[in-house]
Amino acid sequence: MLPKNEEIKALFTLIDDPDEEVFSTISNRLLDYGSPIIPDLENLWENTLEETTLERIEKMIYRLRLKDIHQQLRDWAALPKPSLFEGALILVKYQFPELALDPLRHQLEKIRRNTWLELNNYLTPLEQANVIRNILFSYYQIKGVEVSYDNPEDFLVSSPLQAKPGNAFANSLIYAELCQQLEIHAEWINIPKQCILAYFSADWEPHEIVPNPQEFIQFYVEGTSGHPFSQKDMDQYFLRHNIEPKTVYYKRLSNQRVIKKLILEFAKCFQSPTLHFKQDDLIELAKILD
């Protein structure tokens, strides 16, 4: 049996084999080695000129990274209290595998600390919401843009933390994560086609099943801009869009459900024939959170 490094080298010499069945066998064997061989594949890519071989190497690197993403999401979902932000970072890593995540974590911590300094126990929930909105959208000048499936980066939490515009998903994730870290009762709820956070009253218990959670909601916040609005505004939204209000719309979404929703929306950005494989892969990834 060949030593590990020798076998990898031998497999590399066969990547350009014209027989697709041979390449499939070689590819699957290399995938068994996992992500540690990615630097070697990248080095091979840099020293390869043949177009088909380059595409094969790129595909293998992508599959190795996707395998890691699947494992990271499974590990995250299995945690007793999975962080919403850390779940969103997994999707950032899918799209930008070389991006360092610690600077994003540090930036969020700065925002959390500055928000905490402005809060006190005497503020009403609406005053708390105004503090968060001022910190995010005035002090840090986070910008909100309409949801567009032509701009996948807008869905990622990395965008608002890097002074780039974020859509309702990215900005709402930052807002919701802050509230969870600061123990503020603002939760993502299941309003159709919207990213809405509901501020629940202090006597509401998130893990208790109640017949009508709407009774505990004080007001709502729109994720793109942090703007608060009332139940009357919500009722008008349903009326305007011919949506029949249902109790399920007011139920809190778990962090796993939020991240699943994010992944499936992000997948819609990849509908072109050349990128459709990404949509299929993301839909499969989201199934981990079923």
Task: Annotate each language-model stretch with its function.
Residues M1-D290:
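A structural boundary/capping signal
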